[in-house]
Amino acid sequence: MKRKLIYIFSCWLSFLILFVACDDMEDKPFTSGIIGDPTETGTAELYVLCEGLFNQNNSSLARFSFGNQQIVRDYFKAVNRRGLGDTANDMAIYGSKIYVIVNISSTVEVIDFRTGSSLKQIQMLAENGSSRQPRYIAFHKEKAYVCSYDGTVARIDTTSLSIEAITSVGRNPDGICVQNEKLYISNSGGLDYSSGLGVDNTVSVVDIATFKESSKLTVGPNPGKIVAGPDETVYVATRGEDVEAGDYNFVKIDCRTNKVTQSNEKVQNFAIDGEIAYLYNYNYNTQTSSIKMFNLKTEETIRENFITDGTVIKTPYGININPYSNNVYITEARDYTTYGDLLCFNQQGQLMFRLNNIGLNPNTIAFSDKASQSDIDDNDDDKENPLAFANKVWEYRPAPGQFINTTTSAYKEGFTYDDILEEATRRIQQKSLLTLGGFGGYIVLGFPQS
């Protein structure tokens, strides 16, 4: 007979530990399930960057190996015995290294692809020691270019891993790409949203040879995602003065003439595969999403609904194309506080496979045709405390009338108390946030103990 520890926590920071014997509480370890048949053309591994929660210092990097069908959810931590940091925004594989941009920690984490070990944590700091808050990365001829919220772009040598130079662009850059020996940087001005200054509306063009800004192009309010397209073009999504208002636009830049053309396509994020763009939009009012296929050459919609098999993605959070198979990968963030999923679709919009519970707020996927040599598995990241996590909620009594963040509550309309306990247990098992409502709320948790 197993013995279980039941911990009672209260908002007064007092607690009581009770020991009880029971037979009906089975251990339910958190697992990242695989649905479907994860086979890919020319692809050995994929990596998923998970942003985590703001100011929670819980960003993670997951690895999936197609050869042995194995997921390692917190791959970086399992190898390096430390976390990535706070709010990871972007990732790319370049040469023999993986580069991860960690915004709030203000670092660029450089990882050896072969072993998964950290090679260097580049501190992105201004001369006065303040954080630059890096956002996105692009590469060109053995150099990495990182745009940061402080209005700068850094040039990093990919051999020495040192910052060679810094150049100034617009306000709060929120995207970067390379086209025709130039850098294109979207200047969001997002941090000025609530000030009298308002958001920015420009894309900076930086000549790579001189590493100086040569021009600014007006594209629309609050530009974000920016990607190089076919035929010497660049595409950018503008998000409007208020992101939640849904005033999005898909904008084309002709890099030969600097001509800017706006469309009526409502786009929050997108990926480009040759002449085809996959555009997704999220409506904050209805909490629904849409994903379409768009022909960049003819500027016509190929398919209004990219997904054709009825698969529903509630909260798309990232989209990338596998360059080896041209399959489309979309991440699902759920409610932003529970572990999200990674879904792979073929070009016909049919779900090929799904990796469940890959991490908190998965935002970027990178692919490799070579396999790493680290044989660490998904259990190695928690070896130090295998019994440290609760796996059962016995009682859940939030403070009455004090709910503010309902997305972290187990209460949902129409739920019975048994339903509430089941939902609370699910959140605890997924290591997600669960509110106690306010002063006076408490929860009774069960822990496995031999």
Model-based region annotation:
Residues 5, 272, 286, 427-428, ...:
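Short, ordered beta-strand-loop transition motifs
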Residues 18-21:
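C-terminal motif of bacterial Sec signal peptides marking the signal peptidase cleavage site
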Residues 1-9:
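Bacterial N-terminal signal peptides that target proteins for export
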